[in-house]
Amino acid sequence: MSEADRSSPGSGKTDREDETAENATQDVIAVTPDDERTGLANRLDAHTGDGVRHRAFTCLLFDEDGRVLLAQRADRKRLWDTHWDGTVASHPIEGQSQVDATRQRLAEELGIEPHQYDKLEITDRFEYKRRYLDEGLEWEVCAVLQATLHDTSFDRDPEEVGGAMWVDYEDLYENPRYYRQLRLCPWFEIAMRRDFEGDADPVPDGTRA
């Protein structure tokens, strides 16, 4: 039995139902295609039906040998459960910068603190929309943040991260057949492709950082 099928103690609900209920109490930042804020949207509404375009980020942390740290989404996740992602991905909340949101998720999900990496840089931003089975969708303007880890130790939270591994970034892009057992999240695949194919759109310092 997977974690997604197990009930939380005393609740009678599965972990996935708990996550859905939690999402229903949270908001994301609705945005234009240019990432200009238009208001707030309920997080569950933003990921069901036709969805709502909203602000998001994905972070890629590298070691000094050019390997990227991939994290597997826990099986309790409603969307892209057990798929492999970049290091972390999520949504900033109202009033929170992309950099601060990224630092928070790195600490919460992987126990990685700011002193372990150099400056987080926003290297790209793109819009995408993808559906996942009959569970929902992502419709995001996604910022890409990158940094190099000088201290590569981490301590993953199993409620959020099912597994983690270091992978040669260039090899993953150029030889995907070698990694076909890894189901990759679409936003990570897009970010990686844009990185290598020269489509990345550098973001000026301080612009919605």
Predicted features and spans:
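Secondary-structure boundary elements
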Residues: F62-D65, G111-E113, S153-D155
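A glycine-rich, hydrophobic loop/mini-helix early in the fold
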Residues: A56-H91
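Residues that flank catalytic or metal-binding motifs in active/ligand-binding sites
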Residues: Q26, R55-F57, E64, V88, ...
